[in-house]
């Protein structure tokens, strides 16, 4: 693995850990981190799956120098893959009765609190 890729991987894990703590402090229960449904499914990795009450959030974490660039980094193809990952998770662990699911984005930028963008997109579910 090239050095820059390793650094990016390390930064991504750090950003996810920061988001997990932020979510916990705001009353969320973490159900999974880096959830993968398996090879050959066409599903991507969901960075964080969290629950608060009857709401389950599938959260994509982006660490960028500028918050605006973080949203641009989530392509339509990536959204579809994350949605498939969420569907695979819900196939194994169904929503609670009258439960809801949504897709959120958490943005980590230097010297700023994490930004939690709720209901960032809707596909399928």
Swiss-Prot record:
The family classification in the record reads: Belongs to the UPF0102 family.
Q: What is this protein called?
A: UPF0102 protein Rru_A3692
Superkingdom, according to UniProt?
A: Bacteria
A UniProt-annotated Pfam family: UPF0102
Could you cite one Gene Ontology molecular function of this protein? Answer: nucleic acid binding
């Amino acid at each position: 693995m090239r050095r820059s890729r390793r650094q990016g991987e390390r930064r991504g894990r750090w950003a996810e850990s920061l988001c997990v703590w932020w979510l916990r402090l705001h009353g969320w229960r973490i159900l999974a981190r880096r959830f993968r449904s398996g090879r050959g499914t066409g599903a991507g990795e969901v960075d964080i799956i969290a629950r608060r009450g009857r709401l389950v959030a599938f959260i994509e974490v982006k660490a960028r120098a500028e918050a605006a660039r973080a949203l641009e980094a989530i392509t339509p193809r990536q959204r579809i893959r994350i949605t498939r990952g969420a569907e695979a998770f819900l196939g194994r662990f169904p929503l609670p009765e009258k439960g809801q699911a949504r897709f959120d984005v958490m943005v980590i930028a230097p010297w700023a609190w994490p930004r939690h963008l709720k209901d960032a997109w809707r596909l399928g579910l």
